Amino acid sequence: MKRSEQDIRFQWDLTKIYPDTAAWETAMQEAEAALAPLKDLPGTLGTSKEAFKHGLDTVYASMLKVELPYIYAFLKKTEDGSVAENQEMAARSESLLVKFSAATAFLNPEILAIPAEKLDAWMQDEALAIYRHTVNDIVRMRAHTLDVAREQMLALLGDAAGTPKAAFEMLTDVDLQLPMVKNDAGEEVRLTPGTFPVYRESRSRAVREGAFRAMFGTYRQFGDAIAALYGGSVKFDTYFSNQRGYASACEAALDGGNVPVSVYDSLIDAVHESLPSMRKYLELRRRALKLDKIDVFDLYVPIVEDVDYPIAFEDAKDLVKKATLPLGEEYQKLLDRAFAERWVDVYENDGKQSGAFSCGVFGVHPYVLMNYAGTLGDAFTLAHELGHSMHSWFSDTTQDYVNHDYRIMVAEVASTVNEVLLTKYLLKTETDEKRRAYILNHFLESFRTTLYRQTLFAEFERKAHDLYAAGQPLTASALNKVYHDLEATYYDGIGIDADIDPEWSYIPHFYRAFYVYQYATGFSSAVAIAEHILTTGDASGYLKFLTTGGSDYPLEELKIAGIDLTKPDTVRSALRVFDETVDELSALLL
């Protein structure tokens, strides 16, 4: 469906950012002008405390001016990437962002050049209080900060570094056309990124197998091209990490949030320890589906028969509200605003970015992109993305602009708490045994797809980067083998079809290196937080955590909510819940 044919009630209202394209053009001109004062700053920061404050104030004022038109253009492109004007706006705003990065490349080296004793004395001044965490973080990164010229060079390379991701998105969202498949009614229909998740949950094995082979058969045809794009992304990751003196691209990515690599390793180790629980779940799935052998295209179909669980968007809104009642009145009022003020872009349309996301807009409100198709999974996705949005709202309205932006690690906690609360609400209110079993199955699938699957992805990223670091070419064949072997490890006991091998090429998150592990740590943390809220009735620590934004490091912010990820306890505790839930579902079904 074309976007112009959709009901506007189900489209987000971007006029809250800019009323029209002309206003965006004016904002772009103002953003360009805001770069000019930055030219006078190099060489001044260390001259006096007043000059230091003026420099930081100017940088962040310019950043806000540049960021807003960039976000608007990004949202326009994601709503319909086939529109040439949207593509052009995004490209122009991205270029402006690169200019800003280059113009501020002096900042960190110049701050680091200020004698530590002098800088410490300046930072005691309350006028500089909002910059304390930022400056402390810059000082922490001293060993990985380069001189001004090299920092400028890396900043300018940022635009080129984004090319693999941009090309992948254009290929998969706009240019790549999926084949025709048969739906449950036996009709020939065009497979789309939005309908693929629906068909892989089909009760008809022929439908889900057909969709599986059509999807990944198509991606296999583009395997060499996508391998070249992903290989380019890995090369940039490795180049930047080498330039900054890190032992690996993984270490470089995690160090941005002050997260030790041991947290990454601990997650993978804990999940490997729990693979017997996964095998137990896969055997339950095989028996419940009455199959002699279970294959990879059987992993998503609900294993409870004769339960139809479609959820219209209006019903999903109501469910999310009821599930999050334990989070208090203010949270409820914000959800009402999100729906009434059209924060959410609901349905799929031609040219729209696949999947879902939430995007915070400082000084306005967050926006949510959905491709809602009416499944229980879509209702959970809505809860998930609104969790991000509420996190953005609380952070944006509590913190100043300098400290409002939270890190990915804590973001995935806020979103997944909502998913766990929705699960618990459905289990509490549903009395029908088959529907309860259906919900338990969905909870187990959340563990499989968020904790196990994202950890598998994390291992794939590590292995791909290690291959390149060892001088091995990242061909489609090599990457397919890495992915196949991981599938065989994680899903031991089922048929690992060769058509699953190119699934790695379908995952957009890989173009943001070492990002996905935080889904797994976030899910583990969310299970613990939700259990605490529901058993004690106390959400105060969690709500305080939502207001922290980027004012501290993720691991420290999580401690406010009662979570310590430097120890394996949180992940292991979540995996025990998985094992117990397998037993609970087995008792209902077998």
Task: Please give the residue ranges for each predicted region.
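Auxiliary, metal-adjacent structural segments of Zn-dependent hydrolase domains
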Residues: 298, 303-362, 375-376
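Flexible, glycine/threonine-enriched loop-and-boundary segments that flank and lead into catalytic domains
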Residues: 340-368, 488, 492-513
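Short pre-active-site segment immediately N-terminal to the catalytic Zn-binding motif
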Residues: 363-383
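Short beta-alpha connecting loops at secondary-structure transitions
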Residues: 367-371, 398-408, 437-446, 465-467, ...
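Catalytic Zn2+-binding segment of zinc metalloproteases
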Residues: 387-401
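Post-HExxH zinc-binding segment in Zn-dependent metallohydrolases
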Residues: 406-435, 443-445, 449, 522
